[in-house]
Curated annotation (Swiss-Prot):
Location, primary (coarse class): membrane
GN (gene name): GPC6
Pfam families, alphabetized: Glypican
Domain of life, source organism: Eukaryota
The organism's taxonomic lineage, starting at the top: Eukaryota, Metazoa, Chordata, Craniata, Vertebrata
Protein species of origin: Pongo abelii (Sumatran orangutan)
Protein name from the UniProt record: Glypican-6
Length: 555
């Protein structure tokens, strides 16, 4: 064979071998792709009837293709929208759990307070009549403050309850001693004997413990449901990065461009794409799981010793027992008060005579439990807590499991049983790269998504901080302590640029304010405070002098 024939035939053979399969005479038809593309709601004017050269493609393989530049752009945007919807749908359970249970618990607690107030009012009107109605604002104020505390008001429960018993003592002391006139100063002196005389027996002490820890647990638990709801709602609204959008397009719609619209992504391929796109969400999981554990701890308290229903339901009877105790010991109480505060002035004869029949000698009448209002919100706290505990347990690890939940959907991938007939990002074949671990730092070698592991998502970090703050509150509530965090920024708003703090790098700027008020006389608080400050200053000065002296000796 002449040498020139070989020089011509060999290049021709190479050209033929480089052509796509089926492109021996003419390009393949794009009919199947046109049908699938049109079903997505796109105009068929964008798509060619036959494959064209793919040098214009920016994401998909630049081979013969059914995609124009316009199609690639539209399908890229479509993949972004579908991904956002997928994440919202997949996190639907956790979001609805917190939304619906917050509503139920909030309704229950509010109605419980309303029922308790109504029950006390009905009982006291029936038992004490006009005497109660003339002094009803003392009890109304008690419930107003309890409601204000529950709804987030700055109320110190212990101080508020102490004030209630002091006011009640002042009113009752006047009623059991109608023959005397008491000035405001005298009544203030009377109230100072509340702790010393214990006119109401042990009821105030027990009720203070029960009410304080029950309300702390109830309020903090509902706040926890609020934070969980807000975090879940915010995190489920993802904003994919350009690198993520590129990977989504390549996985979901590059099969269209290759003329394979019915071929679904390989399962492991899908996992790597989702782990790259949801790397920051996975990092939320650690703090989220700690938050869920803390919620479960407080839930146990709610159905146990901190059960607000068991505290509020009989509160009218308990206060009546306290009043009865005061009546029975009225002589001794009056004598000790007169001894400590001095003999009061007699009341005018006309007033004394008119008040005599109205003195507080009505005896306590046991209240029939059958007369109590129906259970708050048509349910009981035990049933609510049992339900929420099950739901909370199911919501653990929800964020790190998002990729697995999304990729196991039959409409999303070819499944694990069809690993040879799936889209691997380049062709219909097995996906070979290994699956990445969860979290941002593990995506450094992700083969599908370009992830900058040095730039954590600020928005997700804000949610991590919100969960961390709430978890601390819940732990304190579990121990019966009320901690109010007074932060300069909204702890869970997610607004603004954020701190960008990771884990414990940034210091928290929270001031702890507890309901455990120090047992200090009100008149001495300023003195003690300034004395403490002077003491600290003196101590600091003394230590400085000692250090300087030691330094001189060492020389």
């Amino acid at each position: 064979m002449p040498s020139w024939i070989g020089a011509v035939i060999l290049p021709l053979l190479g050209l033929l071998l480089s052509l796509p399969a089926g492109a021996d005479v003419k390009a393949r038809s794009c009919g199947e792709v046109r049908q699938a593309y049109g079903a997505k709601g796109f105009s068929l004017a964008d798509i060619p009837y036959q494959e064209i050269a793919g040098e214009h493609l920016r994401i998909c393989p630049q081979e013969y293709t059914c995609c124009t530049t316009e199609m690639e752009d539209k399908l890229s945007q479509q993949s972004k929208l579908e991904f956002e919807n997928l994440v919202e749908e997949t996190s639907h359970f956790v979001r609805t759990t917190f939304v619906s249970r917050h509503k139920k618990f909030d309704e229950f607690f509010r109605e419980l307070l309303e029922n308790a107030e109504k029950s006390l009012n009905d009982m006291f009107v029936r038992t004490y009549g006009m005497l109660y109605m003339q002094n009803s604002e003392v009890f109304q104020d008690l419930f107003t403050e309890l409601k204000r505390y529950y709804t987030g008001g700055n109320v110190n429960l212990e101080e508020m309850l102490n004030d209630f018993w002091a006011r009640l003592l002042e009113r009752m002391f006047q009623l059991i001693n109608p023959q005397y006139h008491f000035s405001e100063d005298y009544l203030e002196c009377v109230s100072k004997y509340t702790d010393q005389l214990k006119p109401f027996g042990d009821v105030p002490r027990k009720l203070k413990i029960q009410v304080t820890r029950a309300f702390i647990a109830a309020r903090t638990f509902v706040q926890g449901l609020t934070v969980g709801r807000e975090v879940a709602n915010r995190v489920s609204k993802v904003s994919p990065t350009p690198g993520c959008i590129r990977a989504l397009m390549k996985m979901l719609y590059c099969p269209y461009c290759r003329g394979l619209p019915t071929v679904r992504p390989c399962n492991n391929y899908c996992l790597n794409v989702m782990k790259g796109c949801l790397a920051n969400q996975a990092d939320l999981d650690t703090e989220w799981n700690l938050f869920i554990d803390a919620m479960l701890l407080v839930a146990e308290r709610l159905e146990g010793p901190f059960n607000i229903e068991s505290v509020m339901d009989p509160i009218d009877v308990k206060i009546s027992e306290a009043i009865m105790n005061m009546q029975e010991n009225s002589m001794q109480v009056s004598a000790k008060v007169f001894q400590g505060c001095g003999q009061p002035k007699p009341a005018p004869a006309l007033r004394s005579a008119r008040s005599a029949p109205e003195n507080f000698n009505t005896r306590f009448r046991p209240y029939n439990p059958e007369e109590r209002p129906t259970t708050a919100a048509g349910t009981s706290l035990d049933r609510l807590v049992t339900d929420i505990k099950e739901k909370l347990k199911l919501s653990k690890k929800v964020w790190s499991s998002l990729p697995y939940t999304i990729c196991k959907d039959e409409s999303m991938t070819a499944g694990t049983s069809n690993e040879e007939e799936c889209w691997n990002g380049h062709s219909k074949a097995r996906y070979l790269p290994e699956i990445m671990n969860d979290g941002l730092t593990n995506q450094i070698n992700n083969p599908e998504v370009d992830v900058d592991i040095t730039r954590p998502d600020t928005f997700i970090r804000q949610q991590i901080m919100a969960l961390r703050v709430m978890t601390n509150k819940l732990k304190n509530a579990y121990n019966g302590n009320d901690v109010n965090f007074q932060d300069t920024s909204d702890e869970s708003s997610g607004s603004g640029s954020g701190s960008g703090c990771i884990d414990d790098v940034c210091p928290t700027e929270f001031e702890f304010v507890t309901t455990e008020a120090p047992a200090v006389d009100p008149d001495r608080r300023e003195v003690d405070s300034s004395a403490a400050q002077r003491g600290h200053s003196l101590l600091s000065w003394s230590l400085t002098c000692i250090v300087l002296a030691l330094q001189r000796l060492c020389r």
